[in-house]
Design a protein with these regions (language model features):
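Extended, intrinsically disordered, low-complexity segments
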Residues: 247-289
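Short acidic/histidine-rich active-site segments
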Residues: 209-213, 231
């Protein structure tokens, strides 16, 4: 099945009251694990790629070609969107030209008018190519590829204004952060989410920083209009822990345990484990049947 944009999967998620997971990929193993899990669980999925990960994997074209080829060779039949995560103005255009089916243009650090102008331009180019666009209001806290945000709560009026640019998905800050949540985190601001949803209407909402948010908060956010949830750090932590245990147990010194395919297997299996947990939590299992 070829790549799809996020429009149809977001619409179905909104109507079905579930969310689609957007899981960041960092290499072939990451991609393989997420695609396998989505196929096994019959779940739609979005593969998120940060600009840093694109650079690590040597470029947008390499990532797009790899994902497309893997979908074909693995006989993946569930809907898969390849999505640029927190893209710059320049990065979003590069991703679109490389064949990404969805992009996030993060202009939240620009003055509002400049953000709106740049967003309109990205929307026009993306829609011409059949791709979808996500935009953000209210900086998400934590760190994302070296960019540190303060975890602002989005202004409903700014959300409404940004919706007017023609975007397909809206990421609105509601106290969520990237990375690990600190012990003193106050939780998601559901009052703010309700106000945003009331103002923007039927546009699918996006929750960034899905790592470590309690299940009850996740489910409540979905009930209030969240249709896409980003997960990155949690996959990294599961991968790291499984790989560390393999090495600490001396498995890499047994036979050909040093073979990269064996060395990376426990971490890859761990990614599948957490992706399954998240897909079940988000309610997307079986929604691609």
């Amino acid at each position: 099945m070829p790549l799809v944009n996020a429009k149809d999967m977001m619409q179905k998620a909104m109507e079905g009251h579930y969310a689609v997971g957007a899981f960041n990929i960092n290499n072939l193993e990451w991609t393989k694990a997420i695609l396998q899990t989505a196929q096994e669980l019959k779940s739609p999925v979005m593969l998120g790629v940060s600009e840093g990960a694109n650079k690590y994997m040597t470029g947008y074209n390499v990532v797009a070609d790899m994902v497309k080829a893997m979908i074909k060779s693995m006989n993946i039949t569930v809907p898969v969107a390849l999505h640029l995560d927190h893209g710059t103005y320049e990065g979003a255009q590069k991703a679109l030209l490389a064949g990404y089916s969805s992009v996030m243009f993060d202009g939240s650090h620009y003055p509002l008018e400049e953000n709106l102008a740049k967003t309109r331009d990205i929307v026009a180019k993306a829609h011409f190519l059949g791709a979808t666009v996500e935009a953000e209001v209210g900086t998400i806290g934590g760190e994302e590829d070296g960019v540190i945000g303060r975890g602002e709560v989005a202004d409903p009026e700014e959300c409404y204004t940004l919706k007017g640019t023609g975007i397909d998905m809206l990421a609105a800050g509601i106290g969520n952060i990237h990375g690990k949540y600190p012990a003193n985190w106050q939780g998601l601001d559901f009052d703010a989410l309700k106000k945003i949803k009331a103002r923007v209407g039927d546009i699918p909402l996006v929750l960034h920083g899905g790592t470590g948010i309690p299940e009850d908060m996740i489910k409540k956010a979905i009930s209030l209009g969240v249709c896409k949830i980003n997960v990155n750090t949690e996959c990294q932590l599961y991968f790291q822990e499984a790989t560390r245990k393999y090495i600490e147990a001396g498995k890499d010194l047994e036979g050909k345990g040093f073979d990269p395919r064996k060395l990376l297997a426990p971490g890859t299996d761990a990614i599948k484990e957490i992706v399954k947990i998240k897909m079940e939590m988000f309610g997307s299992v079986g929604k691609a049947e």
